[in-house]
Curated annotation (Swiss-Prot):
SUPFAM superfamilies: YnzC-like. This is UPF0291 protein LCA_1274. Keywords: Cytoplasm. Coiled coil: none annotated. Belongs to the UPF0291 family. GO terms for cellular component: cytoplasm. It comes from Latilactobacillus sakei subsp. sakei (strain 23K). Pfam families: DUF896 (PF05979).
Length: 80
């Protein structure tokens, strides 16, 4: 988590510098690499949260999408 915050802080620092005075080519590359890494981690975390999700209707019947159920079965998270 601390690494994510450091990465995010550096992305923001480079964004402020880009608006204020511009970035060197090296800083532009660094910013893009940091953004790509951050987005990769974010997407992975989000996917994990969605894969753990179970959806129920008002009557209490599970209505989790089949695609999510299949992924949960593959990962051993579901017995049915």
């Amino acid at each position: 988590m601390a690494m994510d915050q450091k990465r995010l802080d550096r992305i923001n620092e480079l964004a402020h510098k880009a608006k204020a005075e511009g970035l060197t080519p090296e800083e532009t590359m660094e910013r893009q690499e940091l953004r790509d890494a951050y987005l990769k981690d974010f997407r992975s975390s989000f996917r994990s949260q969605v894969e753990m999700l179970q959806v129920y209707d008002k009557e209490g019947k599970e209505v989790t999408p089949e695609k999510v159920k299949d992924i949960q079965r593959e990962k051993g998270l579901r017995d049915d």
